[in-house]
Amino acid sequence: MAHKKGASSSRNGRESAAQRLGVKRFGGQRVNAGEIIIRQRGTKFHPGDLVGRGRDDTLFALAAGSVQFGTKRGRKTVSIVPQQ
């Protein structure tokens, strides 16, 4: 039995780097405009008040305030409560 494989063979791909997805700022935490709140694939969380959605579904703050999680029409949402 040969211990070398044929010319066009591979020994499996290497493991890819983690994508570092998830919640970056939790409920009640203060954020500034532009700060990333959640990195996600797809819309597991939907943007609420004063929250924007990036091309890759990242949710970010549009204004300074505190993060608030909730539900609207059966969907999980993330909103910003503006600072007084």
UniProtKB/Swiss-Prot annotation:
InterPro entries: Ribosomal_bL27 (IPR001684), Ribosomal_bL27_CS (IPR018261)
Any one GO BP annotation for this protein: translation
Keyword Translocase on entry: no
MF (Gene Ontology): structural constituent of ribosome
Keywords per UniProt: Ribonucleoprotein, Ribosomal protein
Keyword Ribonucleoprotein in record: yes
Region (Disordered), start-end ranges: 1-23
Entry-linked Pfam families: Ribosomal_L27
Gene Ontology CC terms, in alphabetical order: cytosolic large ribosomal subunit
Similarity field: Belongs to the bacterial ribosomal protein bL27 family.
Name by which UniProt lists this protein: Large ribosomal subunit protein bL27
